[in-house]
Amino acid sequence: TMSEGATSGTTEMKKPEVTAIDYEVVKNDLDHVILLAPDFVYGYYNRGNVSSLLKDYRAALADYDKAIELSPDFAEAYFNRGLTHIFLGNNKQGIADLSKAGELGIVSAYNIIKRFTDTRE
């Protein structure tokens, strides 16, 4: 019936699935942003996030390092670098970064540290 078609049409309007190819396009755009503005901290931070989504964790760490070098109080960069380190098994570095993120105002970082250390004991 007509109402069924209308209903199924609305369910198809949900958020389109993002593919790895889309992330590669974004990463290429961010490469250009960084070339044009090498001191733009969010270029590195966002490219680090995209690299993480693409499972290129080493590249993500390098970009978070650069973002932190450019902006030493960039809490979100410490937070994401900490999570990446923990994911890669660099627990000590990860916890140190999460602790710094907590000091800089991301209170949820402390909850992650607590959960992580509770399960590791």
Language-model-detected regions and their locations in the chain:
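Alpha-helical tetratricopeptide repeat
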Residues: T1-E121
